[in-house]
């Protein structure tokens, strides 16, 4: 590993993280109690009067609030429509989150696109500029199809809740080259036909794989494209701690890469060997070494082609 990559990995771990996991087959109260027991605090409460969304909350040893909220987009009975919303996390908290996910799975919780459940990951945007956000948008535009195939993103979700980058947004962004965040926001909302209610939570511009509405309202970059595998007779699936960590690592490295680039192109990458294209891209992003081996596996396993040779053996 060269010095530049090592520094990049060091920096990506300094970013803040927020995760939302939609699931069912578990009540919000039970999930909150399970979390409170997992944290060793035993503290969980019904907090809907403050948080809305029929929320139950659990607190960890650092007094951080983990919310379990009702999300009507999830299939199933209302009592078991459950969305985990984490507090602001750091890289070292990922293991704690993974352990909680494992316990939720053992308790019967299920999450996959077949029940309308996805995974949203937020990365703190405080160190980003209009140029680095433009870089990130171009990185996503040039690799979204590859990522969608790698994750086998449900087409229904792509049509509604996690659309690809709007071509009009990319065209205007790269033509106008916004110098400040106000100009960037104007391009984002007008190009996406959502110039109304910019401060409203459910502004329609949010329903993209890369959601900058969160940037302007919450100070985070939201990646809305993730999902867990649907359970089969052979594998329980539905929630997977290793898969979740892989998704978080991808978001962190994309955000950090965007900060280090002078410019980025929205032009789509080669597609004759998707597995090779993804593997080499992940390496360029900095997902190298044993620490990111699981991420490389999850992000290439569904793609066709030869990971080692672009034109085959």
Which stretches of residues belong to each language-model region?
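Short, conserved phosphate-binding/catalytic loop or strand-edge motifs used
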Residues: 115-119, 123
């Amino acid at each position: 590993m060269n010095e530049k990559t090592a520094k990049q990995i060091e920096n990506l771990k300094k970013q803040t993280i927020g995760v939302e996991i939609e699931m069912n087959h578990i009540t919000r109260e039970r999930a909150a109690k399970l979390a409170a027991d997992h944290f060793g605090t035993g503290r969980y409460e019904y907090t809907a009067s403050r948080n809305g969304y029929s929320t139950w909350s659990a607190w960890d040893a650092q007094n951080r609030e983990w919310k379990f909220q009702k999300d009507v987009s999830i299939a199933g009975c209302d009592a078991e429509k459950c969305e985990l919303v984490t507090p602001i996390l750091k890289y070292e908290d990922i293991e704690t989150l993974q352990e909680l996910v494992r316990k939720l799975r053992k308790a019967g919780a299920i999450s996959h696109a077949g029940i309308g459940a996805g995974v949203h990951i937020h990365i703190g945007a405080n160190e980003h500029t209009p140029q680095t956000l433009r870089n990130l948008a171009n990185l996503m535009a040039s690799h979204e199809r590859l990522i969608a195939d790698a994750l086998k993103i449900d087409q229904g979700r792509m049509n509604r809740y996690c659309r690809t980058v709007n071509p009009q947004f990319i065209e205007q962004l790269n033509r106008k080259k916004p110098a400040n965040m106000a100009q960037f926001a104007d391009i984002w909302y007008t190009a996406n036909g959502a110039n109304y209610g910019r401060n409203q939570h459910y502004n329609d511009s949010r329903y993209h794989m890369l959601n900058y509405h969160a940037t302007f309202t919450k100070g985070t970059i939201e990646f809305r494209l993730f999902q867990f595998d649907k359970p089969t007779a052979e594998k329980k699936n539905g929630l997977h701690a290793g898969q979740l960590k892989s998704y978080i690592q991808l978001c962190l490295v994309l955000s950090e890469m965007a900060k280090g680039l002078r410019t980025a192109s929205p032009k789509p990458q080669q597609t004759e060997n998707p597995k090779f294209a993804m593997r080499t891209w992940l390496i360029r992003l900095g997902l190298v070494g044993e620490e990111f081996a699981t991420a490389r596996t999850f992000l290439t396993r569904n793609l066709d082609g030869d990971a080692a040779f672009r034109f085959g053996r």
